[in-house]
Curated annotation (Swiss-Prot):
Cofactor: Mg(2+)
This enzyme's EC code(s): 2.5.1.3
Protein name: Thiamine-phosphate synthase
Reaction catalysis annotation: 2-[(2R,5Z)-2-carboxy-4-methylthiazol-5(2H)-ylidene]ethyl phosphate + 4-amino-2-methyl-5-(diphosphooxymethyl)pyrimidine + 2 H(+) = thiamine phosphate + CO2 + diphosphate; 2-(2-carboxy-4-methylthiazol-5-yl)ethyl phosphate + 4-amino-2-methyl-5-(diphosphooxymethyl)pyrimidine + 2 H(+) = thiamine phosphate + CO2 + diphosphate; 4-methyl-5-(2-phosphooxyethyl)-thiazole + 4-amino-2-methyl-5-(diphosphooxymethyl)pyrimidine + H(+) = thiamine phosphate + diphosphate
Any Gene Ontology CC annotation: cytoplasm
Organism of derivation: Geobacillus thermodenitrificans (strain NG80-2)
Gene: thiE
Described function: Condenses 4-methyl-5-(beta-hydroxyethyl)thiazole monophosphate (THZ-P) and 2-methyl-4-amino-5-hydroxymethyl pyrimidine pyrophosphate (HMP-PP) to form thiamine monophosphate (TMP).
Amino acid sequence: MARITSEEMKERLAVYFIMGSQNSERPAEDVLKEALDGGVTLFQFREKGSAALEGEEKEALARQLQRLCRTYGVPFIVNDDVELAIAIDADGVHVGQDDEDARRVREKIGDKILGVSAHNVEEARAAIEAGADYIGVGPIYPTRSKDDANEAQGPGILRHLREQGITIPIVAIGGITADNTRAVIEAGADGVSVISAIASAPEPKAAAAALATAVREANLR
């Protein structure tokens, strides 16, 4: 499998949905199917937290959601768990600054998609050197979806990264909604990444569609 190109990666990052069983009171498969119907372009399985599944249950859910993504032709990314990603032949892995070293992850996963969380120019450059295909930058706005989230930085961090010569595809995360998507894209992000904006929405399909429309309209300006 050849490495994904930068242009392909940018397109995939448009509406990046992150979810685990702990993020919704409804069955994860139902929420994901509706989100995919609404226009999600990339999915990350993030099973973390005190209520998260483990072991065989975690793998079973991962495979279930992966099958759904394959039906829609949407890449399936695993958060942090490199061994699980390899075991189920996921399309890629995303790691944070406190997870396994990105360079080692790249060696393990070969040409699969590698995403790395970055909060500043130094971390962004390190991710690029490690072989990342994209970086996740945030939190842009305050968020309650992650217990360990850093302080919100605002869209200005995206603009700063671009001004410092960071050209790698960037997805913005943290408190993203359809209403603030335009500001994020105009500041330099290629796409938006959300958890609660879709997982907690009464209608995940409509929520995903609203984000997709917002990204598309922002890119036309």
